[in-house]
Each structure stands twice: as structure tokens, then as C-alpha cells.
Amino acid sequence: MNALFTTAMALRPLDSDPGNPACRVFEGELNEHWTIGPKVHGGAMVALCANAARTAYGAAGQQPMRQPVAVSASFLWAPDPGTMRLVTSIRKRGRRISVADVELTQGGRTAVHAVVTLGEPEHFLPGVDGSGGASGTAPLLSANPVVELMAPEPPEGVVPIGPGHQLAGLVHLGEGCDVRPVLSTLRSATDGRPPVIQLWARPRGVAPDALFALLCGDLSAPVTFAVDRTGWAPTVALTAYLRALPADGWLRVLCTCVEIGQDWFDEDHIVVDRLGRIVVQTRQLAMVPAQ
């Protein structure tokens, strides 16, 4: 099967309710190349929901095109790879902000409910340090922890997830994107602090876009690896912010947490592009795997 990210994000419009023009229905497919273990990758579903909201907004004749600047997703159950239906409803059409509801279903059962805020992300001029050269083009304030820790490209020795890789049995995204984690960062720090997981990623065959950047906001192995809990860690809720559209090249992903409890843990991702700009931030609540 085709493993291209653009294919995974493709949507086919289905018959919608003519009496409700704000509601549109699409069909998509996330195949085995977009799975973690036997189940569909949560970040891929977030990206697909975001695309459905964006597409529904455009289909309603709204101009200019808006991007999914925020996605708040609740995960009700984990679907299998295959065909999915996305039911969208535009809740607000505004001059700067619009809002859409999206339900991703499989077999008549809702797997993800997402509220997508559509707007215009930042457009900072490129700079080596992520800032622009002209007044008004740089962030007013930025505390970007990634640029000091991670180079724009993965160093030699940081290999992609694929056959023979330590994570290949769990992460099946290698056909569709090049994911290169620093395995040593999956462990807790020697002083007992939570892990600071580092990885690089880019889609194969195409440049990274807003949707791939959103997927990267859920790309790291769970931080529970640091406490030897490496089983299934289902995400319950995830919020993602698209801060800017990524430049072509590698995306740097930094994954951290505040607390791993007995039952619940939090996990944050910061995604930075080749130019050093923050393009996505996410925070999720998930369940700690059993021992």
C-alpha cells in the first residue's frame, strides 16, 4: 500500500445533508504504515481531523484558506488501520477565527472527537535563530529550548526507525516518514528528572506541511519508557497548537513531561523547523502502561 503522507491525508467527499450546509462528510484511510503497534497512530488521526476541518471550511466557499491553528482532541477508542469517516460541522465563521467540530468514526463508532480552530498562523521571516531581520517579524518573546539542544539535522549515528531498529516492532511509520530518535534520551536523567526525548523527522517524498507538523506533536515514544513502562500508553486527550508553517527540511521534536503518576502522565512536544522556528506545541494526558 502507498505510504506517502499526502496519500494518508487524502479525503474523499461523501454525500452530506443538503438541509445542513454547515455539515460535510469525508472518507479517509490510514493504513498499516500509520500505526503504533496494531492501532492507528494518534497524531495521524489528529492531522486527518485537522485536514477535514480545513477542507470543510474551504468547501463552504470561505476565503482566504485557513489553517488548523489549534486542535483539541478527545480519544474515545483506538481504531484499526483502514477506512474512516470524518463528519464535520462548522460552528463559527469569523473574520479571523472559525471553529469546526470533527468526529472521526470507524464502523459507526466514534474514535476521535476534535474541535478545530481555523485561523492564520504566524509568518516570521526566516533567520538562523528563528527571528526576522525586519521590525515586527520576530516573536515579541520566545523561550525556545530546542535550538540550543538540537542541530537542524540529525547527527551521524542517529539512525531512522526501520528494520532492525530497537523501536521497529512498535513504530510502523518508517515507510511514510524518516523518524530518527536519540535512543539515549528515552531514559531518565541521572539526577532523577524526567526524560527530555529528542528526535528528528520528515515525510518521505514530500516537504513537511502543517498537517505533518501536527503529526509530529505526537511522534515521540511515550515518556513512560524512562520508568520502564513500555507497553500501550493510550492518549485520552491532546491539544495541539500550529504556531507557524514549517520550512522544508527536518523537523526537530523535543518531548518532555512534568509527572508520571501511577495511572496518568502528561507529555509535551515542541516541534521546531529547519530555521529554528517553533511550528507546533502539544500537550496530552495519557494512561500509564501496566507493569
UniProtKB/Swiss-Prot annotation:
SUPFAM superfamilies: Thioesterase/thiol ester dehydrase-isomerase (SSF54637)
Signal sequence bounds: none
SMART domains: DAGKc
InterPro entries according to UniProt: ACOT8-like_C, Acyl-CoA_hotdog, Diacylglycerol_kinase_cat_dom, HotDog_dom_sf, Sec_Metab_Biosynth-Assoc, TesB_ACOT8-like_N
Alphabetical list of Gene3D superfamilies matching this protein: Acyl-CoA thioesterase, double hotdog domain (2.40.160.210)
PROSITE patterns for this protein: DAGK (PS50146)
One Pfam match: 4HBT_3C
DAGKc domain boundaries: 68-205
Source taxon at top rank: Bacteria
Molecular function in Gene Ontology: kinase activity
Coiled coil: none
Protein name: Uncharacterized protein Mb0510
